[in-house]
From Swiss-Prot:
One of its GO terms (biological process) is cell differentiation. Residues 33-68 are annotated as: Disordered. Glycans are attached at N42. The modification Sulfotyrosine is found at Y80, Y82. Its main location: secreted. Keywords: Developmental protein, Differentiation, Glycoprotein, Growth factor, Secreted, Signal, Sulfation. Sulfation is important for activity and for the binding to a putative membrane receptor. PSK-alpha is produced by endopeptidase digestion. PSK-beta is produced from PSK-alpha by exopeptidase digestion. This is Phytosulfokines 1. Belongs to the phytosulfokine family. The gene is PSK1. Residues 23-79, 85-89 form a propeptide. GO terms for cellular component: extracellular region.
Length: 89
């Protein structure tokens, strides 16, 4: 005979495991998207400027070209120099 309490617990644990697996998969997918869109060191530290039609800013002529995020670039550069100084004093 099947115990209803035991069945409910097993079903609850199964649902919890599925939710955790789904969350892990979603987190990994977001992490991969973040890595691809904000790569470091290979010329991909740029941000897309919104187009003029969408009400975005009117910086550098908005022809779809990528524009460097200078603050982020300076941060990466400073971190790199600091890391090199620590590795090779």
């Amino acid at each position: 005979m099947v115990n209803p309490g035991r069945t409910a617990r097993a079903l609850c644990l199964l649902c919890l495991a599925l939710l955790l697996l789904g969350q892990d998969t979603h987190s990994r997918k977001l992490l991969l998207q973040e890595k691809h869109s904000h790569g470091v060191g290979n010329g991909t530290t740029t941000t897309q400027e919104p187009s003029r039609e969408n009400g975005g800013s009117t910086g550098s002529n908005n022809n779809g070209q990528l524009q460097f995020d200078s603050a982020k670039w300076e941060e990466f550069h400073t971190d790199y120099i600091y890391t090199q100084d620590v590795k090779n004093p």
